[in-house]
Amino acid sequence: MPTIQQLIRSAREKTDKKTKSPALKSCPQRRGVCTRVYTTTPKKPNSALRKVARVRLTSGFEVTAYIPGIGHNLQEHSVVMIRGGRVKDLPGVRYHIIRGTLDTAGVKDRRNGRSKYGAKRPKA
């Protein structure tokens, strides 16, 4: 425990917060081009084929981003928008592709939570 005199002499050091999404460079979203679209398997105890894409961003980074929702239309050279947000059971995947923007179509026949998947309101 420092004395008040010691604190006057040199103040406490601020700890720098490390960002969880460095490729975004403090922006809410970033645009990028898919370099590879593939499936990968999650960590134990889960089992699935998760859809992911390798994306080259305008910030110069190349990152792995998750493609949420059922079915997608992405392929190599698709232009996508990514946001932060990791996928807990896929190591190294720290970004999500935003559905319904640029070349990414929204999820078809989606009725609940539509805004998260870029789906339009269904006709009554």
Swiss-Prot record:
Gene3D superfamilies, alphabetized: Nucleic acid-binding proteins
GO BP: translation
Residues where 3-methylthioaspartic acid is found: 89
GO molecular function (one): tRNA binding
GO cellular component: small ribosomal subunit
Keyword Ribonucleoprotein: yes
Stretches with biased composition (Basic and acidic residues): 10-19
Residues covered by region (Disordered): 8-28
Signal as UniProt keyword: no
Keywords recorded for this protein, A-Z: Methylation, Ribonucleoprotein, Ribosomal protein, RNA-binding, rRNA-binding, tRNA-binding
Domain of life: Bacteria
PANTHER family per the UniProt record, alphabetical: 30S RIBOSOMAL PROTEIN S12 FAMILY MEMBER
Function: With S4 and S5 plays an important role in translational accuracy.
Entry's family note: Belongs to the universal ribosomal protein uS12 family.
Quaternary structure annotation from Swiss-Prot or TrEMBL: Part of the 30S ribosomal subunit. Contacts proteins S8 and S17. May interact with IF1 in the 30S initiation complex.
Name used for this protein in its record: Small ribosomal subunit protein uS12
Gene name for this UniProt entry: rpsL
